[in-house]
């Protein structure tokens, strides 16, 4: 009976009026902002995470120790706290110099930067695990044949590591789209902030939040569909390798497959492995 009473009190006319048509709704703009922040923050997190992962697997303590400390801080503190520190605490700590104005005076920039820095800490471990999962014997063989370290990384290690890195990376894209809701605490006009603005004006709390939930579901469904397509493509690549079929020209160009490495010196007689 209570559930029926709750359902009866739900204002469907308000819900559908706000939800449709979407081009008349501020939620559409907020949803676009969520996608934009997600794309920028996650991509920046991947790039920074790759750099940090190289430091993480380095044997040089000058590279490894700072990365360990970075991961300790960003993985050990709440994301919401980091957002508040970046937007509100940084200005007080530094005296708000002009150079920090783009961060301390723009909530979108501060929020996106914090999300990227936080995500880099998690992408570091994902990328590190992928890089270290590649058979060390392949790396040793390539080095023994005279391939430069950079070529070994980008022609042998990275293409194989991507099969491990890509699935959790797209999960991180989906998580990032939901983490943008935390930016409502610093007045970034994303979906949750837009819903809060609506229900402070018309007092339809549940209906306003329900509209935001629908938009979040649309965004996560869209990202999930992309994830499945990319994972399917990686599955096809694996089948091609097993079947011995040649890779398409664009793929050979990206990975360097089938190209002669000029850094390799000497020849190896047939049936003999050069070590």
Which ranges hold each PLM region?
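Transmembrane alpha-helices and adjacent helix-loop boundaries
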Residues: 1-275
């Amino acid at each position: 009976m209570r559930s029926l009473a709750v359902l009866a009190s739900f204002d469907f006319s308000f819900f559908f009026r706000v939800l449709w048509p979407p081009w008349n709704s501020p939620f559409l703009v907020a949803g676009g902002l969520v996608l934009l922040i997600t794309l920028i923050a996650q991509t920046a997190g991947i790039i920074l995470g790759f750099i940090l992962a190289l430091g993480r697997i380095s044997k040089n303590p000058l590279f490894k120790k700072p990365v360990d400390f970075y991961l300790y801080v960003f993985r050990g503190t709440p994301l919401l706290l980091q957002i508040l520190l970046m937007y509100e605490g940084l200005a007080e700590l530094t005296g708000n110099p002009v150079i920090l104005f783009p961060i301390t005076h723009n909530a979108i920039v501060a929020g996106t930067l914090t999300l990227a820095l936080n995500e880099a800490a998690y992408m570091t471990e994902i990328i590190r695990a992928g890089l270290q999962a590649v058979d060390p014997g392949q790396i040793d063989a390539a080095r023994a044949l005279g391939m430069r370290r950079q070529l070994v990384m980008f022609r042998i290690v990275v293409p194989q590591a991507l099969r491990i890195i890509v699935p959790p990376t797209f999960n991180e894209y989906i998580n990032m789209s939901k983490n943008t809701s935390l930016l409502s605490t610093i007045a970034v006009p994303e979906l949750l902030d837009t819903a809060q603005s609506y229900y402070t004006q018309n007092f339809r709390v549940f209906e306003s939040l329900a509209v935001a939930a629908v938009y979040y579901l649309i965004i996560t469904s869209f990202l999930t569909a992309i994830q499945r397509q990319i994972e399917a493509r990686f599955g096809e690549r694996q089948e091609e390798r097993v079947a011995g079929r040649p890779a398409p020209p664009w793929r050979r160009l990206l990975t360097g497959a089938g190209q002669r490495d000029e850094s390799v010196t000497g020849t190896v007689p047939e049936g003999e492995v050069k070590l």
